[in-house]
């Protein structure tokens, strides 16, 4: 599985979190893992750990996003866009092995695929403030 595909699956899990109670997190992770096509144990573990880390830091990530995004606080953002932005901001702030430009580009591509017509530009605009 490519890093882009892994990132896409992390996004899918973060999006699910918006609609389910945190007590259902383990069940949602298991459902996501069941949807994956032949993932290795290492890939499953990486996805699970990254999702858990992002969820653990969610309040901090949201505060950073609110600070940088003018006119659009996290509580007003589309859930798809917010999940993508949280993922990218987590990578920018906590994963030094991923270049910022890569995180932003991957986020924009996810926004174009899963978001509304203007999501790519919106996500790029918010994340550019983290570069």
Swiss-Prot record:
- Sum up the protein's function in the record's words: Involved in transcription antitermination. Required for transcription of ribosomal RNA (rRNA) genes. Binds specifically to the boxA antiterminator sequence of the ribosomal RNA (rrn) operons.
Protein family membership: Belongs to the NusB family.
Which of UniProt's keywords are assigned here?
A: RNA-binding, Transcription, Transcription antitermination, Transcription regulation
State the GO CC annotations.
cytosol
List, alphabetically, the NCBIfam families matched: nusB
Which Gene3D superfamilies does UniProt cross-reference here? Answer: NusB-like (1.10.940.10)
Organism per entry: Agathobacter rectalis (strain ATCC 33656 / DSM 3377 / JCM 17463 / KCTC 5835 / VPI 0990)
- What would be the name of the gene that encodes this protein? nusB
Q: Name one GO biological process term.
A: transcription antitermination
- Disulphide linkage map: none
Keyword Transmembrane belongs to the record: no
Picking any one GO molecular function of the record gives:
RNA binding
Entry protein name: Transcription antitermination protein NusB
């Amino acid at each position: 599985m490519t890093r882009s595909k892994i990132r896409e699956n992390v996004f899918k899990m973060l999006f699910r979190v918006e609609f389910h109670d945190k007590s259902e997190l383990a069940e949602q992770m298991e459902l996501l893992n069941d949807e994956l096509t032949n993932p290795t144990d290492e890939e499953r573990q990486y996805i699970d750990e990254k999702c858990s880390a992002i969820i653990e830091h969610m309040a901090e990530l949201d505060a950073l996003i609110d600070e940088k995004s003018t006119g659009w606080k996290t509580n007003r953002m589309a859930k798809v866009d917010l999940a993508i932005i949280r993922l990218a901001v987590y990578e920018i702030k906590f994963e030094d092995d991923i270049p910022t430009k890569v995180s932003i580009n991957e986020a924009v591509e996810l926004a174009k695929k899963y978001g509304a017509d203007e999501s790519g530009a919106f996500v790029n605009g918010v994340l550019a403030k983290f570069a």
